[in-house]
């Protein structure tokens, strides 16, 4: 079932929760609504569900205008972050609940309900827990039961509000993979809310990035990461360092630091160069391409990677910089906390001083022999 949102807006008192926005969701897509708290993503999800009314605009499920249709008649399944399971009911009864409260004329037979519940529990790999109660389940098991209950009524659209937010990191990762696999198997249209960038990029066919009630960008995870269209999107996707640059003497400067742009660059202006943590090289000496001195303030192993936190020396940055390396690469570099190092960007994304529009990608693929004091 496709979803089309046209000119949707919402106010709570004087607060503009959603500015007029438009969004088309194709049948069978999994869409992630990503943004910080207060961005409007949950309000938008609730409006799609019918739990909130829009102040303006229209919502279509396929060719059906559901703008004024009550939530019970929209054929929507909803999964909450806190599961919302009934503690006094068994797992099987929780899954069956949505079917048993359907008006009698439309309600499946008792045998059909039992058959559907058994099938759903097997599908979520929890058939052996049918007679247990929610308090006897783990967080991950509860979320699977909540999903099975949402699917029991065979909804046209599945909506999920931060479905894995209450779970630990390992369980979240496992459930993300499981949900994506289930979605690909059943091919239902689904929309979920998250503030977790990794979750949005891993699960979504397309990501909708939101801020202050507006849609900032809609794209596939790969394209969104490769081509963020604004400073906000770049900042929110995380793991990015920002060099506030003044154009002087054919290079970008900031205090004692400088970066020489690639040859023939048209960007002879002030602005900001964004450099991702894995696109930053470190060495114990500066070079002709860049002079960006730091003190290493922390070295933190994170799984297969090591995060190096860097404090600027002689120039200004609002935040510490980060560089990421493999454990092997870190050993080769011989970095230690308290050491002075010099950074060089491999790739950067330049925004002009106004910060409007898409960034211009800058790459330093090679330099003339002898121009570097170390190999990048």
Curated annotation (Swiss-Prot):
Write down any Gene Ontology CC term: ATP-binding cassette (ABC) transporter complex
User: Is Transmembrane helix one of the keywords UniProt gives this record?
Assistant: no
- Give the UniProt keywords, A-Z: ATP-binding, Cell inner membrane, Cell membrane, Membrane, Nucleotide-binding, Sulfate transport, Translocase, Transport
- Which InterPro entries does this chain map to? AAA+_ATPase, ABC_SmlMolc_Importer, ABC_transporter-like_ATP-bd, ABC_transporter-like_CS, Mo/tungstate-bd_C_term_dom, P-loop_NTPase, Sulph_transpt1, TOBE-like
In what way does this protein cross or attach to the membrane?
Peripheral membrane protein
- Assembly mode: The complex is composed of two ATP-binding proteins (CysA), two transmembrane proteins (CysT and CysW) and a solute-binding protein (CysP).
Q: What does this protein do?
A: Part of the ABC transporter complex CysAWTP involved in sulfate/thiosulfate import. Responsible for energy coupling to the transport system.
Q: What is this protein called?
A: Sulfate/thiosulfate import ATP-binding protein CysA 1
Q: Could you tell me which species this protein originates from?
A: Shewanella oneidensis (strain ATCC 700550 / JCM 31522 / CIP 106686 / LMG 19005 / NCIMB 14063 / MR-1)
Question: What lineage is this protein's organism placed in?
Answer: Bacteria, Pseudomonadati, Pseudomonadota, Gammaproteobacteria, Alteromonadales
């Amino acid at each position: 079932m496709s979803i089309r949102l046209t000119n949707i807006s919402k106010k709570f008192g004087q607060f503009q929760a959603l500015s007029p926005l438009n969004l088309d969701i194709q049948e069978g897509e999994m869409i992630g609504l990503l943004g910080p708290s207060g961005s409007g993503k949950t309000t938008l999800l609730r409006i799609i569900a019918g739990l909130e009314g829009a102040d303006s605009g229209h919502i279509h499920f396929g060719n059906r205008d559901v703008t004024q249709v009550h939530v019970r008649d929209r054929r929507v399944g909803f999964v909450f972050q806190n599961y919302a399971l009934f503690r006094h009911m068994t797992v099987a009864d929780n899954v069956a609940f949505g079917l048993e409260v359907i008006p009698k004329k439309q309600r499946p037979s008792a045998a059909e309900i039992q058959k559907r519940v058994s099938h759903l529990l097997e599908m979520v790999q929890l058939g052996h827990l049918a007679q247990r109660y929610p308090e006897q389940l783990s967080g991950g098991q509860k979320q699977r039961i909540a999903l099975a209950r949402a699917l029991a009524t065979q909804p046209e659209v599945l909506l999920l509000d931060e479905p894995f937010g209450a779970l630990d990191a390992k369980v979240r990762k496992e459930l993300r993979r499981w949900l994506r696999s289930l979605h690909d198997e059943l091919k239902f249209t689904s929309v979920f809310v998250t503030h977790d960038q990794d979750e949005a990029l891993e699960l979504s066919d397309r990501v909708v990035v939101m801020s202050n009630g507006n849609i900032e960008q809609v794209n596939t995870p790969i394209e969104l990461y490769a081509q963020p269209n604004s400073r906000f999107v770049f900042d929110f996707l995380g793991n990015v360092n920002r060099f506030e640059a003044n154009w002087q003497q054919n290079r970008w400067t900031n205090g004692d630091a400088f970066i020489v742009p690639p040859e023939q660059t048209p960007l002879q202006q002030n602005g900001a160069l964004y450099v991702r943590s894995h696109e930053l090289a470190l060495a114990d000496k500066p070079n002709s391409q860049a002079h960006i001195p730091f003190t290493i303030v922390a070295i933190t192993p994170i799984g297969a990677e090591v995060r190096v936190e860097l404090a600027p020396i002689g120039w200004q940055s609002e935040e510490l910089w980060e560089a990421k390396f493999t454990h092997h690469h870190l050993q080769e570099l011989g970095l230690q906390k308290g050491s002075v190092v010099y950074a060089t960007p491999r790739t950067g994304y330049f925004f002009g001083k106004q910060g409007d529009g898409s960034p211009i990608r800058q790459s330093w693929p090679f330099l003339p022999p002898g121009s570097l004091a170390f190999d990048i």
